[in-house]
Amino acid sequence: MALQDLRTYYDSVEKEDFNSLLNQRCLVTEKIQASSLHVRREDDGLKFYKSGNKQPLNKIDRTIVSYYERGIGHFDALIKEKIDEMPMDWKFGFDYMINEKTVDIEYDTLPKNNLILTHIQVLNEDRTQIRKVIRDPRILEKWADILEVQSPEVIFEGILADYQKEKLINILSLQGEQARMKFEDFTFSYHAFKVFNESTHKAMLNNDIHKDIDGLVVSFLEGKTLKNFKLQSPLKEAKEVEPRKSSDAYQ
């Protein structure tokens, strides 16, 4: 499911409603520009799903689109005991990368075994619907360790301080020439990281926080509802308005 843009949400709601959102418990991780790969254990072995597809990849798919073979090969190489630990009603969602250079971002490194565990879908009894989505960083870290992949790095977790809220609103208010001037000396990536964690000096797959990133995932817990947003540069958003050819690797 696509993430709602935080800037769009900020522009569309009343100030009081947005401030109320900022008062909720917050979790921030980096948004990686990568492919999506889902994995689920069934009676006859693991099934692999591309992007948002409900049908698993079959042998013909894998022959035509060999892009996913490195990721699939990683799971084929895991010991049986680790595979057997995977609950059959859980569908594990991963960011998947085989090259440091993506559509318009060049990272310094690749994730562990090319995979980042970003979420886990808990399915209903007949496995046709998603009952809930697990994004708890502690659960993801545990399963990433079991499956020998990377887990999301938590940039911030807790209640935002007033100065953080002010910095965030300042970034969300920027657009056009004002944004270009703001990010001329220090990039959007630098400013975004510093909103949530002033001691951060390294991005998830970059050696510093000055290089471009795809954005941040900013989540707020309202009661029992988790609201997930993407925070991206207004310059990137303006560029994405222009149509471009889709790439199977980044759907």
PLM segments and residue spans:
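Core nucleotide-handling region used for phosphoryl-transfer chemistry
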Residues: 1-251
